[in-house]
């Protein structure tokens, strides 16, 4: 804070949201923000009434109670929530096809899974992994208005395949080279059951047991692959990285920063894909990346409420094709998790 500053004012979309009388050079000022894009103006005022302002935006707000900045980090597999597990198993068994489910409260570690280690066609879900590797390589977020910023926006918000291929080429000189880079990054995070497999085809109780990761069925296919367990761990790592914690920060020290995580979370908050975890909107703020092909439909993301944060991953496959029942399953799993939070 500049010398001589006596007061700080914060305006959100032009509305005065907070003021602070300055008595020391360093201080914290907490300002709740809505779950939508806003512009923040921070003004410093000296004893003569002169103003100096900084404008920041757009900024997308998340509940303070869900922030990953402090407190113990639950074990990776946490513990199985018996009530939630019964619901998740029931939903998994009733789905007309094969599905893989994983859900976890990121504050308590309680969660449930169904067929979470079965490999599914990954479709567009691994585009988040492309984005993580790109920001690790760039050592920072791309400049607003730049080609890379536009490609990232189109890839994560609109799930554009051409943009994903161009970013793979940026990473490795070709889609296969970029794919190898993404695979290497995922292996470093321990995500051993996922495979980028080149670029995208362009078409128009008192005792707590760990969350179980058994395989009850898996589709037969060749190509990009992932599991509910791998995707959930990637989303969890992104959440923790926003608070300068977790595997992305520790494993890639200095190369992947909290600002990178928050940038990707901002893009995920603006995903235009329909269905799936979107059915939980109204009960939670949803940051997610969906993926689909004719026989597979998936959604994986982070759900934020005033009380906490959750990771929810739902992968579905049916040899005869998938549709609204996959979206309905994702919504039901998400709402079941929120009810237990």
Regions found by a protein language model. Name each.
Residues 109, 119-143, 155, 312:
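Active-site SXXK
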